[in-house]
Curated annotation (Swiss-Prot):
Residues 99-122 are annotated as: Essential for activity. Residues 90-111 form a coiled coil. Binds to the sigma-S subunit of RNA polymerase, activating expression of sigma-S-regulated genes. Stimulates RNA polymerase holoenzyme formation and may bind to several other sigma factors, such as sigma-70 and sigma-32. This is Sigma factor-binding protein Crl. It comes from Salmonella schwarzengrund (strain CVM19633). Its main location: cytoplasm. Keywords: Activator, Coiled coil, Cytoplasm, Transcription, Transcription regulation. InterPro entries: Tscrpt_reg_Crl, Tscrpt_reg_Crl_sf.
Length: 133
C-alpha cells in the first residue's frame, strides 16, 4: 500500500520499527499508525503478564506532505488496554514527558529526512506536553 505522501507503507513500518519498541503493527490501519510506551510499572509485585503500566500512546496519520499526531497519557491495564487517566505523581509524569519527547524527536527527525512534516492534528487542542516548537 502506498500512502498519500507516496511512500510505501511497508517501508515506513520498517523505519518506524527502527525507532525503538514503540510501534504496534497490529493496531496500524490504512494511513494511520499506532505507537505506545509502557514507561513506568505501577506495581512490580504481580507476575509480568499481570502488571499495569503508566505510559502514553500516539496515533499518527499520514497525509500528503505531513504526518499529524495526537497522544494521550494513561494506564495500560493487565488486559492490554489503554485508559486515559490523570496521573498525579510528579516523577511518573516527568518520566512520561521525557520518553514522549525523546520519541517525538526521533520521529520528527526521521520524517524530516523523508521531506515530511510532523504536526499536531488539527483537532488536537489539549496537548499536555508541547512537542513542536
Amino acid at each position: 500500500m502506498t500512502l498519500p505522501s507516496g511512500h510505501p507503507k511497508s517501508r515506513l513500518i520498517k523505519k518506524f520499527t527502527a525507532l525503538g519498541p514503540y510501534i504496534r503493527e497490529g493496531q496500524c490501519e490504512d494511513n494511520r499508525f499506532f505507537f505506545d510506551c509502557l514507561a513506568v510499572c505501577v506495581n512490580v509485585k504481580p507476575a509480568p503478564e499481570k502488571r499495569e503500566f503508566w505510559g502514553w500512546w500516539m496515533e499518527l496519520e499520514a497525509q500528503e506532505k505531513r504526518f499529524t499526531y495526537r497522544y494521550q497519557f494513561g494506564l495500560f491495564d493487565k488486559e492490554g488496554n489503554w485508559t486515559a487517566v490523570s496521573i498525579n505523581e510528579t516523577e511518573v509524569v516527568e518520566r512520561l514527558e521525557y520518553t514522549l519527547r525523546e520519541f517525538h524527536e526521533k520521529l520528527r527527525d526521521l520524517l524530516i529526512s523523508m521531506e515530511l512534516a510532523l504536526e499536531p492534528s488539527d483537532d488536537f487542542n489539549d496537548e499536555p506536553v508541547k512537542l513542536s516548537a
